[in-house]
Structures are given as structure tokens and as C-alpha cells.
Amino acid sequence: MRLSNADLERLKSMANTLRFLCADMIDKANSGHPGVCLGLADVMVVLSLHLNINPTNPKWLNRDRLVFSGGHASALAYSLLHLWGFDLSLDDLKRFRQLHSKTPGHPELHHTEGIEITTGPLGQGFANAVGFSMASQYAQTLLDKEAVSHKVYCLCGDGDLQEGISYESASLAGHLRLDNLIVIYDSNQISIEGAINISFSEQVKTRFLAQNWEVLECDGHDYQAIHDVLEEAKKSPKPTLLIAHTIIGKGAIGLEGSEKTHGSPLNKEVLKQSKENAQINPDESFIISPKNKMHFEEVKVRGVSLEALWEKSLSPKTKKNPCVKEF
């Protein structure tokens, strides 16, 4: 599907809303990781067009699973959950990284609605996503393929793929041909210590091809390209690694591509200039236009409809199966 010019403008506006909502959270907390949030914003607004979840019922059995393997991107996760319509308020975002808040420094299962798994140690979330995919295939044997047909999306970065746990679990995923697993690799070539080539020169694409994965690549700031590879990934008969070539700190004036955005808030002047450049009022914080809020909440509207259709499609036998509720 070709995105129209209106679609592209809408996605750009949504991405900037997401970027600076994250930046404001981190600025208020005076702690966090803005680089990944700014760099992945374009990918995430396009993923919003593909993700099948229902924020009014976070435990819907056939929802897509979304794993943030890089748990340090928590501001991005929380901003999206709020914008998509989960039970996470703007005030919750303003309490980011505060004691007893619903928005801790790293995402925690059973603590924040919409978070699928606790993540933090790099590589762990990748393995969790493989486990989710395996679980869905097992669930199909207990129910049926129509009842369990969701995708598992995992967001990972350079650091995740340097860890042994991601290598081992990727090998298993390829061996089992986990075709509902889509890993989006935020390839920005930067870590907290600087350029990734200081410590890592492996050919990641070649590694995953050898492990029996589909490997796709795109410019992580080109909305049409992101959309196209996501469409292709959903049809793959194997697990897919989607390499999104991104710029860490995208939109941060003077700091794009710099490791300085990895684990420190943007300074006040950079944040002000960056907002101005994105045509956002620099004197205001936590701003979400009604139009953009409506666009993000299309995820919820779609999810409610999809769950209703799913319920109707279940066979009488499947509806009586206790596993429907247990999963």
C-alpha cells in the first residue's frame, strides 16, 4: 500500500509528538535515555498502523505482543501506551522514574498496564520474545490457528545483539521457524561508549541469515520504507530480523548521531531549539494535539473491532476450551 502525502504528513506530526513527549518526560525526571526514543519514533508511528492490540482489554488472548528488549527505552514505551489509550495518564508520564510511580525507569510486568515483560538486561527481552513466539505455537496445538494468530514484535538495539543470550535464542528461533516473530533492530551504530565499531564489527545480517532468519532492511526514518518491510515481514515463513537504520537522537539539534543522547537528558537549550525546529511551542511541555491523540488512538479503535471479530470467529468447541481464559 502506498502512503499518501497526507499519511506521510500525519506520521511526521505523530512522530514529533512522540519524540518530544519522551524528551519532556526525561527532562522533568532529569534522568533517562532520550537517544533511542528520538531515533525510534518514526518506526513506532508506522508500527502503530500494523499493531493489533486492544488497550481496553490488555489481556486479549490474540493480541500482538510487543517487547522492548532495550528496557532503557522506557519513556518511549510509556508514551506509546498513553497515546494508544492504555490506563496510563499524562500525570503518570510526568512522574517518570519517581518512587512508587506507574512509570519506573525500566518497564515492569504487572506494574504498568500494557507492559508484556520486565526488561533491562540487554538481550534478555530478545529471548523473552522468542519464548512468547514458542508459547503461541504451543497454544495453537491446544486451541486452533484461528484463535491464536498474533505476531510477536521485539525492539532491540546494538547492545542486545552483542549479548550471548540473543545469539542462542535467535538460533533456536530460526531452527523452529517461528514465523510470527518480528525483531526490529534499531541499528544506530552507537552505544554509551561511542561508535559501536569500538567493540563490535560482526556482520549481523550474515549471522541471522545463517541462523535461518529472513533479514530485511530499511531507512528507519522513511515511513513508506518502514511500512513496506513490515508488510513483507508479516508474510515471512521464518522469523524476521528487520534492520532499521536509524540516527540516535533524531531531531535533537546539534546532537543527532551522538552518544551524548544515549543516557543523559537533552540540555534545556537543545530541547528548546529542537522543539522550535519541529514547529512545537518550546515554552510548553507534554503537549499532545487532539488531532494527534485521535490518530494514535486509532490503535484502540482497531483493536476493539478486531477483538469483537475474533470472538465471533471462535468455534463453539474453542469457546468451551478452558485454555482460552488461561492463556
Describe the predicted segments one by one:
Residues 1-150, 296-327:
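Thiamine diphosphate
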Residues 54-55, 111-298:
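Glycine-rich ThDP/TPP pyrophosphate-binding loop and its adjacent helix/strand module
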